[in-house]
Amino acid sequence: MPIFKGGALAGAIGISGDGIDQDDMIAFLGLANAGAALGTVANAPAATRADNINVPGGRLRYVNCPVSPFLDTNASNVCNGL
């Protein structure tokens, strides 16, 4: 997951879990939470994310966020607006 600081690419983080289904979501939400707490880092601007790139057969995926990703909570669409 790319990390932006002041609108410029500053680095990246990766997550390796027990599967591939939510690794990108955890990195995405972790960076969003860090940005909210620190005010200095952010996810890529929406206009520059990979899911804006069309390739034959579809679009590239930036992050996959299931509608209801967490157990024992009613939280849904947790990536919307980030």
Please provide the spans of the model-predicted regions.
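Mobile, glycine-rich extracellular loop/lid and propeptide segments
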Residues: 1-82
